Amino acid sequence: MATARASADGVHNAPETVRQSDDKKDITQVERVLSVGDEKGEHADYNRIDQEVAKYAGASEVFVSEEENKRLKKMIDRRVLPIMVITYFLQSLDKGTMSATSIMGIRDDVPGLLSKETFGWLTTCIYLAVLVVEYPTNWILQRVPVAKYLGFNILAWSTVLACHALCFSFPALVAVRTLLGIFEAVCQPAFLIMTGLWYKREEQAQIVTYWYMMNGAQQIVGGLLAYAFSTIRHPSFKANPGNAPIRSWQAIFICYGCISFLWGLYVIFTLPDSPMRAKCWSEEDKKLMVERVRSNQTGLQNKKFRAYQFKEALLDPQTYCYMGIQIFTTLPTSGLGAFYNIIIQDLGFDVLQVQLLAMVLGVVIIATLMGSAWMVKKTKQNLLTMAVFMIPAFTGTIVIMTVKNTNNATKAGLLISYWIIFTFWAAQGLGMSMLTRNVGGQTKKSVCITMNFFAWCAGNAIGPKVFFDGDPRYLKSLSIHLGCYSALLCVIAFLRFNLMLRNKKKDREFGKEISNAHGFDDLTDKENPNFRYVY
């Protein structure tokens, strides 16, 4: 009875704004025979469900066996997951190419790039562009076929990337980098939406980790490829001139652009837009794929804008906590990433050694993200896991700030310390997966994702700008990073306390039994009595 009472309360005791919104009935109604449990309030409210979802969602929860769940997940893993992973890999590779080319002669060929502050703008302008287009991108993603829109943007950014090879002035590079940011802005929001569309709540942390750890994979593969391209020596290459007809940095931009363009075509013709539109599977399988994510309690898709959800997103403290997690992790990440090769070269390594050492950073990032996902799976503790992975970041930063590079031993120690700083990447990945699992209501989720990536962009844009000329040991930059780590720990502590209180309040008011009948009703996490937060 607790379940029935919770479900009924969730529908009948919704905020006044919800009732007023629902009084305006849709012109087209979905006609269905309601289940036996309807009088108990354990059936879906079809006035609130997206009509495309309603064609496949049962009036009440449909049981999907464990065997069926595994079979369906394997089907999704074979079709959707590889595309997400490879797309994110290519996006990370394309975006990170400027760091690889920073020691391949581009700073000598383009006037003004020898200044660290000027060079930093080539990363900053990408994220300023993403910042401007983030909300329009999220708005579009809620209303168009996700796969087709993603594929179009891949084609666009790959073309822009290849055009980098034609740029021999700072304004030209800023222009193409800005366009690159505009078209790549679709990637993470699209993948967060797709993760929620295709995967159950308990699967999402691992899925986000799979595609997000491609940041590390691109360091490994990118390091190898950059090493290979560094052997191309044009007569203009001051460090070691040769007789190649093309500069190494031009070759890498053209090659990566062509590969990404071909991949964009594959995505357009292969990736399903949603479980409801997947032509590659039977109608019965599509119904089961929809039903298996009902328990997420976050909805599937809904094109209707609900003003009260917009307001709730702006007033919800967890929105700003997720923003804090992003800005306090991306600010250090973007700066360290943009100047990675330059920092390692300053330790006394040559160009080819630096390109190979970039691979180790990739291993650290992958190990961090996989390790944090494994720890969450075993302990069910997302925020405590974030805090644990902050310890090496503090340690590595303090060592670099206090130890001078005087011999081979300190050189090796500083290199290792630099690598372990990147363990704070765990907070980025877990923060994004928590957002997809803890925010209900499509309008609210869209606003939260947009604001989350505003913070992500702001951190990435500011990060390279805290590296100053005349600061050879980067003491000012690293001091700012320590401040970010400290602020992040405060955010983690507050968010954990806040979410624990919310769950206890719902347990007291509605009981601990949970019904999934209203999982597609486009209710927010606050108004849905069956919703419980993960922390």
Regions found by a protein language model. Name each.
Residues 99-132:
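Extracellular/periplasmic helix-loop-helix junction of adjacent transmembrane segments
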Residues 205-238, 244-248, 254, 259-260, ...:
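Glycine-rich segments within core transmembrane alpha-helices of 12-TM secondary carriers
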Residues 382-431:
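C-terminal transmembrane helical hairpin of 12-TM major facilitator-type secondary transporters
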Residues 99-100, 308-373, 432, 460, ...:
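Extracytoplasmic gate region of multi-pass secondary transporters
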Residues 123-138, 359-371:
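Central cavity-lining transmembrane alpha-helices of secondary-active solute carriers
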Residues 1-90, 268-299, 303, 445, ...:
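Intracellular terminal tails of multi-pass secondary transporters
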Residues 131-171:
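Conserved MFS/SLC helix-loop-helix module at the cytosolic interface between two early adjacent transmembrane helices
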Residues 169-177, 321-322, 409-417:
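Short hydrophobic/alpha-helical segments at membrane-entry points of transmembrane helices
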